[in-house]
Amino acid sequence: MDADSSSRSPRDTRTCARPKEKVPYFADEGRERDRVRNLRHRKTSITRPTTSHRGRPMRARSRSYSAERNCCQRRRRSRSCERRHSDTRHKLTTATVTKQRRRRSRSRSRSRSRTPRIITVPVPVPAADYPYAYAWPPPPQAPQFNPMYGAVPYGMPSRPVYPAHPYFAPYPRPRLTFPYRAPPFRPHPRFSYRNQRPAPN
């Protein structure tokens, strides 16, 4: 090599620029950009689970909790459709992986537990021996106006007095109502009493 500096070989590194010190990758914009791109494009290999893919444990009743379904994601879809896709289930491509990772998880209010059990608690009900429609205090009696029947003093009774007629009583009981105490009959102002048929029984 000559003393002439113009004849230096290109590999000669005597006057090479001093290498700039390395900044960490998150500070160097270019390196960070291709690091993220490599992360995104890297092939993810999915190891297939070692459990048997079909069948369910002997004592498990529901098929939703079996190895027959996808182990990490319980989907509700028909079994025929699942059988059709059963070989594709564990071979997930990168796009599917990304899409599944991006998908929103199910809202926390939708419970993942099984069918809720109806819990029956014996609650001591006071006065359990009273008849079904018994209410106390008795409901206020609205003045009954039923145009199908003729004018009845005090309107129609809303429900029969309980018990209505004890047929097999040891002796005939006295009547519980006293018709002579009924108030004088006043015709209803908005009801016409002509052409009355007898009330249907």
UniProtKB/Swiss-Prot annotation:
Residues 9-37 have a biased composition (Basic and acidic residues). InterPro entries: Tra. It comes from the Eukaryota. Keywords: Differentiation, Nucleus, Sexual differentiation. Coiled coil: none annotated. Residues 1-117 are annotated as: Disordered. Pfam families: Transformer. One of its GO terms (cellular component) is nuclear speck. One of its GO terms (biological process) is cell differentiation. Residues 38-62, 99-115 have a biased composition (Basic residues). It is found in: Nucleus speckle. The sexual regulation of tra occurs through a mechanism of sex-specific alternative RNA splicing. The non-sex-specific RNA expressed in males is not translated. RS domain directs localization of proteins to the speckled subnuclear compartment and the purpose of this localization is to allow colocalization and co-concentration of components of the splicing and splicing regulatory machinery to permit relatively high rates and/or efficiencies of reaction and interaction. Member of the regulatory pathway controlling female somatic sexual differentiation, regulated by Sxl. Activates dsx female-specific splicing by promoting the formation of a splicing enhancer complex which consists of tra, tra2 and sr proteins. This is Female-specific protein transformer. It comes from Drosophila hydei. The gene is tra.
